[in-house]
A protein has these predicted regions:
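Rieske [2Fe-2S] iron-sulfur-binding domain
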Residues: 2-92
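C-terminal catalytic domain of Rieske-type non-heme iron oxygenases
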Residues: 17, 76-285
Protein backbone atom coordinates (compact mmCIF):
# COMPACT_ATOMS: atom_id res chain seq x y z
CA UNK A 1 0.00 0.00 0.00
CA UNK A 2 2.78 2.42 0.86
CA UNK A 3 6.41 2.74 1.83
CA UNK A 4 6.29 2.96 5.63
CA UNK A 5 8.69 5.92 5.61
CA UNK A 6 6.09 7.91 3.67
CA UNK A 7 3.26 7.38 6.19
CA UNK A 8 2.87 10.36 8.49
CA UNK A 9 2.46 9.59 12.20
CA UNK A 10 -1.14 10.36 13.19
CA UNK A 11 -1.98 11.50 9.65
CA UNK A 12 -4.85 10.02 7.68
CA UNK A 13 -3.92 8.45 4.34
CA UNK A 14 -6.37 6.92 1.90
CA UNK A 15 -6.03 4.64 -1.09
CA UNK A 16 -7.96 2.03 -3.07
CA UNK A 17 -7.55 -1.73 -2.86
CA UNK A 18 -9.62 -3.96 -5.14
CA UNK A 19 -11.99 -1.05 -5.66
CA UNK A 20 -12.54 -0.47 -1.93
CA UNK A 21 -11.51 2.73 -0.13
CA UNK A 22 -8.90 1.99 2.54
CA UNK A 23 -7.42 4.27 5.22
CA UNK A 24 -4.11 3.93 7.03
CA UNK A 25 -1.80 5.77 9.40
CA UNK A 26 0.88 5.26 12.05
CA UNK A 27 0.40 5.65 15.79
CA UNK A 28 2.68 7.51 18.20
CA UNK A 29 4.92 4.43 18.43
CA UNK A 30 5.32 4.40 14.66
CA UNK A 31 3.22 1.24 14.27
CA UNK A 32 1.02 1.09 11.18
CA UNK A 33 -2.76 0.66 11.31
CA UNK A 34 -5.05 -0.09 8.33
CA UNK A 35 -8.84 -0.06 8.18
CA UNK A 36 -11.77 0.29 5.80
CA UNK A 37 -12.56 3.96 5.23
CA UNK A 38 -16.16 3.35 6.25
CA UNK A 39 -14.72 3.16 9.80
CA UNK A 40 -12.95 6.54 9.60
CA UNK A 41 -13.37 8.78 12.66
CA UNK A 42 -16.14 11.36 12.22
CA UNK A 43 -15.35 14.36 9.97
CA UNK A 44 -11.85 13.10 9.14
CA UNK A 45 -10.27 14.30 5.91
CA UNK A 46 -7.29 12.93 4.00
CA UNK A 47 -4.11 14.38 5.47
CA UNK A 48 -5.82 15.43 8.70
CA UNK A 49 -4.70 14.37 12.15
CA UNK A 50 -6.60 11.26 13.18
CA UNK A 51 -7.21 9.71 16.60
CA UNK A 52 -6.46 6.04 15.97
CA UNK A 53 -8.29 5.04 19.16
CA UNK A 54 -11.52 5.96 17.36
CA UNK A 55 -10.86 3.64 14.42
CA UNK A 56 -13.07 0.57 14.07
CA UNK A 57 -11.89 -2.97 13.33
CA UNK A 58 -8.44 -2.87 11.70
CA UNK A 59 -7.55 -4.97 8.68
CA UNK A 60 -4.77 -7.58 8.80
CA UNK A 61 -1.45 -5.96 7.98
CA UNK A 62 2.26 -6.64 7.77
CA UNK A 63 5.32 -4.42 7.45
CA UNK A 64 7.84 -6.10 5.16
CA UNK A 65 10.62 -4.89 2.86
CA UNK A 66 9.90 -1.37 4.14
CA UNK A 67 6.28 -1.41 2.89
CA UNK A 68 2.87 -1.66 4.50
CA UNK A 69 0.87 -4.67 3.24
CA UNK A 70 -2.78 -5.45 3.89
CA UNK A 71 -5.62 -7.65 2.67
CA UNK A 72 -9.40 -7.54 2.61
CA UNK A 73 -9.54 -11.23 3.44
CA UNK A 74 -7.95 -13.68 5.85
CA UNK A 75 -5.05 -15.37 4.03
CA UNK A 76 -3.66 -18.62 5.40
CA UNK A 77 -0.08 -17.90 4.30
CA UNK A 78 2.57 -15.25 4.82
CA UNK A 79 4.10 -12.80 2.36
CA UNK A 80 6.94 -14.28 0.29
CA UNK A 81 10.55 -13.76 1.38
CA UNK A 82 13.46 -11.94 -0.24
CA UNK A 83 16.51 -13.39 1.58
CA UNK A 84 18.88 -10.82 0.05
CA UNK A 85 17.25 -8.13 2.19
CA UNK A 86 18.98 -9.66 5.22
CA UNK A 87 22.42 -8.82 3.81
CA UNK A 88 23.58 -5.87 5.88
CA UNK A 89 25.58 -4.09 3.17
CA UNK A 90 22.62 -3.71 0.82
CA UNK A 91 20.81 -0.47 0.09
CA UNK A 92 17.11 -1.22 0.61
CA UNK A 93 14.71 1.53 -0.39
CA UNK A 94 11.52 2.47 -2.21
CA UNK A 95 12.42 3.58 -5.72
CA UNK A 96 9.07 5.32 -6.07
CA UNK A 97 5.34 4.58 -6.00
CA UNK A 98 3.46 5.59 -9.14
CA UNK A 99 -0.14 5.39 -10.33
CA UNK A 100 -0.55 3.57 -13.65
CA UNK A 101 -3.76 3.09 -15.61
CA UNK A 102 -3.34 -0.60 -16.34
CA UNK A 103 -4.08 -3.91 -14.61
CA UNK A 104 -1.59 -5.45 -12.20
CA UNK A 105 -1.03 -8.57 -14.36
CA UNK A 106 -0.23 -6.39 -17.39
CA UNK A 107 2.42 -4.59 -15.33
CA UNK A 108 3.95 -7.90 -14.23
CA UNK A 109 4.03 -9.20 -17.79
CA UNK A 110 5.73 -6.05 -19.07
CA UNK A 111 8.35 -6.38 -16.30
CA UNK A 112 9.11 -9.91 -17.53
CA UNK A 113 9.64 -8.81 -21.13
CA UNK A 114 13.28 -8.36 -22.22
CA UNK A 115 12.34 -7.91 -25.86
CA UNK A 116 11.30 -4.28 -25.40
CA UNK A 117 14.61 -3.14 -23.86
CA UNK A 118 16.25 -1.76 -27.06
CA UNK A 119 13.10 0.03 -28.20
CA UNK A 120 11.66 1.47 -24.98
CA UNK A 121 14.82 1.87 -22.86
CA UNK A 122 17.13 2.82 -25.74
CA UNK A 123 20.68 3.55 -24.67
CA UNK A 124 20.04 2.29 -21.14
CA UNK A 125 18.77 -1.29 -20.88
CA UNK A 126 19.21 -2.04 -24.58
CA UNK A 127 20.26 -0.70 -27.95
CA UNK A 128 19.84 -1.66 -31.60
CA UNK A 129 21.02 -3.80 -33.33
CA UNK A 130 21.66 -5.97 -30.24
CA UNK A 131 18.04 -7.03 -29.93
CA UNK A 132 18.17 -10.82 -29.64
CA UNK A 133 16.65 -12.52 -26.61
CA UNK A 134 18.68 -15.70 -26.17
CA UNK A 135 17.09 -18.94 -25.00
CA UNK A 136 16.45 -19.15 -21.26
CA UNK A 137 14.75 -21.49 -18.80
CA UNK A 138 11.39 -21.15 -17.06
CA UNK A 139 10.18 -23.31 -14.18
CA UNK A 140 6.71 -23.09 -12.67
CA UNK A 141 5.52 -24.37 -9.32
CA UNK A 142 2.37 -23.62 -7.37
CA UNK A 143 4.34 -21.00 -5.42
CA UNK A 144 6.08 -19.11 -8.22
CA UNK A 145 7.28 -18.67 -11.78
CA UNK A 146 11.09 -18.62 -12.08
CA UNK A 147 13.03 -17.67 -15.23
CA UNK A 148 16.80 -18.30 -15.18
CA UNK A 149 19.69 -17.96 -17.60
CA UNK A 150 18.36 -14.69 -19.01
CA UNK A 151 21.06 -12.52 -20.62
CA UNK A 152 20.89 -9.21 -22.45
CA UNK A 153 23.42 -6.57 -23.52
CA UNK A 154 22.82 -3.27 -21.74
CA UNK A 155 24.63 0.04 -22.38
CA UNK A 156 23.78 1.33 -18.86
CA UNK A 157 22.61 -1.55 -16.70
CA UNK A 158 22.46 0.38 -13.42
CA UNK A 159 22.99 3.80 -11.89
CA UNK A 160 26.57 2.84 -10.97
CA UNK A 161 27.46 1.24 -14.32
CA UNK A 162 30.60 2.60 -16.02
CA UNK A 163 29.92 1.07 -19.43
CA UNK A 164 28.02 -1.54 -21.40
CA UNK A 165 27.80 -5.15 -20.27
CA UNK A 166 25.97 -8.40 -20.90
CA UNK A 167 23.72 -8.50 -17.85
CA UNK A 168 22.53 -11.78 -16.37
CA UNK A 169 18.95 -11.84 -15.14
CA UNK A 170 16.73 -14.06 -13.04
CA UNK A 171 13.01 -13.29 -12.90
CA UNK A 172 10.77 -14.47 -10.09
CA UNK A 173 6.99 -14.13 -9.75
CA UNK A 174 6.08 -15.17 -6.17
CA UNK A 175 2.63 -13.53 -6.20
CA UNK A 176 0.13 -12.84 -9.00
CA UNK A 177 0.71 -9.08 -8.69
CA UNK A 178 4.38 -8.96 -7.62
CA UNK A 179 7.51 -9.62 -9.68
CA UNK A 180 11.21 -9.60 -8.82
CA UNK A 181 14.27 -9.17 -11.00
CA UNK A 182 17.73 -10.30 -9.93
CA UNK A 183 20.50 -8.83 -12.08
CA UNK A 184 24.27 -9.18 -11.97
CA UNK A 185 26.13 -6.39 -10.17
CA UNK A 186 28.57 -4.41 -12.30
CA UNK A 187 31.18 -4.14 -9.51
CA UNK A 188 30.78 -7.70 -8.16
CA UNK A 189 29.55 -10.34 -10.66
CA UNK A 190 29.20 -12.89 -7.83
CA UNK A 191 26.22 -10.97 -6.42
CA UNK A 192 22.90 -9.73 -7.76
CA UNK A 193 20.87 -6.58 -7.27
CA UNK A 194 17.18 -7.12 -6.57
CA UNK A 195 14.57 -4.90 -8.19
CA UNK A 196 10.90 -5.62 -7.61
CA UNK A 197 7.54 -4.29 -8.64
CA UNK A 198 4.87 -4.64 -5.95
CA UNK A 199 1.62 -3.79 -7.73
CA UNK A 200 -1.29 -2.62 -5.59
CA UNK A 201 -4.49 -3.38 -7.56
CA UNK A 202 -6.52 -0.24 -6.89
CA UNK A 203 -9.09 -1.36 -9.45
CA UNK A 204 -9.04 -3.95 -12.22
CA UNK A 205 -7.46 -1.40 -14.56
CA UNK A 206 -5.50 0.89 -12.25
CA UNK A 207 -2.54 0.17 -10.01
CA UNK A 208 -0.14 1.85 -7.64
CA UNK A 209 3.23 0.40 -8.60
CA UNK A 210 5.76 0.30 -5.78
CA UNK A 211 9.35 0.06 -7.08
CA UNK A 212 11.47 -1.83 -4.53
CA UNK A 213 15.27 -1.72 -4.64
CA UNK A 214 17.82 -3.89 -2.82
CA UNK A 215 21.15 -2.81 -4.28
CA UNK A 216 24.81 -3.67 -3.84
CA UNK A 217 26.06 -0.13 -4.45
CA UNK A 218 28.25 1.90 -2.10
CA UNK A 219 28.79 4.70 -4.63
CA UNK A 220 25.42 6.08 -5.72
CA UNK A 221 23.25 8.26 -3.49
CA UNK A 222 19.68 7.27 -2.64
CA UNK A 223 18.44 10.00 -4.98
CA UNK A 224 20.59 8.68 -7.83
CA UNK A 225 19.27 5.14 -7.37
CA UNK A 226 15.68 6.38 -7.22
CA UNK A 227 16.11 8.67 -10.23
CA UNK A 228 17.46 5.83 -12.39
CA UNK A 229 14.60 3.51 -11.42
CA UNK A 230 11.99 6.22 -11.99
CA UNK A 231 13.52 7.00 -15.38
CA UNK A 232 13.18 3.36 -16.44
CA UNK A 233 9.69 2.93 -15.01
CA UNK A 234 8.54 6.23 -16.48
CA UNK A 235 9.38 4.87 -19.93
CA UNK A 236 7.43 1.70 -19.16
CA UNK A 237 4.45 3.68 -17.85
CA UNK A 238 3.77 5.19 -21.27
CA UNK A 239 3.78 1.74 -22.87
CA UNK A 240 1.61 0.21 -20.15
CA UNK A 241 -1.07 2.88 -20.38
CA UNK A 242 -1.37 2.28 -24.12
CA UNK A 243 -1.94 -1.46 -23.71
CA UNK A 244 -5.25 -2.80 -25.02
CA UNK A 245 -7.01 -4.40 -23.39
CA UNK A 246 -5.76 -3.06 -20.06
CA UNK A 247 -6.57 -6.39 -18.44
CA UNK A 248 -4.29 -9.30 -19.29
CA UNK A 249 -5.81 -11.90 -21.66
CA UNK A 250 -5.21 -15.44 -20.38
CA UNK A 251 -6.31 -17.21 -23.55
CA UNK A 252 -3.07 -18.41 -25.24
CA UNK A 253 -4.61 -17.57 -28.62
CA UNK A 254 -5.25 -13.94 -27.69
CA UNK A 255 -1.78 -12.63 -28.64
CA UNK A 256 0.97 -14.10 -30.85
CA UNK A 257 3.85 -15.45 -28.72
CA UNK A 258 7.57 -15.14 -29.58
CA UNK A 259 10.69 -16.35 -27.74
CA UNK A 260 10.87 -13.15 -25.68
CA UNK A 261 7.39 -13.98 -24.36
CA UNK A 262 8.37 -17.33 -22.85
CA UNK A 263 8.09 -16.07 -19.26
CA UNK A 264 4.83 -14.30 -20.05
CA UNK A 265 3.32 -17.49 -21.47
CA UNK A 266 4.19 -19.40 -18.29
CA UNK A 267 2.93 -16.51 -16.15
CA UNK A 268 -0.44 -16.43 -17.93
CA UNK A 269 -0.82 -20.18 -17.60
CA UNK A 270 0.10 -19.94 -13.90
CA UNK A 271 -2.57 -17.28 -13.31
CA UNK A 272 -5.13 -19.34 -15.19
CA UNK A 273 -4.32 -22.45 -13.12
CA UNK A 274 -4.75 -20.40 -9.94
CA UNK A 275 -8.19 -19.28 -11.10
CA UNK A 276 -7.29 -15.58 -10.90
CA UNK A 277 -10.08 -13.35 -12.21
CA UNK A 278 -9.19 -9.80 -11.06
CA UNK A 279 -7.38 -7.76 -13.70
CA UNK A 280 -7.47 -10.43 -16.40
CA UNK A 281 -9.58 -11.49 -19.36
CA UNK A 282 -10.32 -15.13 -18.62
CA UNK A 283 -9.64 -17.78 -21.25
CA UNK A 284 -12.70 -19.07 -23.06
CA UNK A 285 -14.00 -22.29 -21.54
Amino acid sequence: MSAVSEIGVGRLHRTLLLGELISYSRDSNGDAVVWRSTSDPTNSAKGATVDLSEVGSPLPMRVKFGYLWTTLGNPDHEIFDIPECDETDRRVLNGGSLMVNVSAPRAVENFLDMGHFPYVHTGLLGIEPRTEVVEYNVETTDAQVLATGCKFYQPVAAASAAGGQVTEYTYRVPHPYCVLLYKSVHADPSRMDVIALFNQPMTEERIRAHNFLSMVDDVSSDNTLKHFQQLIFGQDKTILENQFPKRLPLDPRAETPIRADKSAIHYRRWLSNKGLTYGVVAAAS
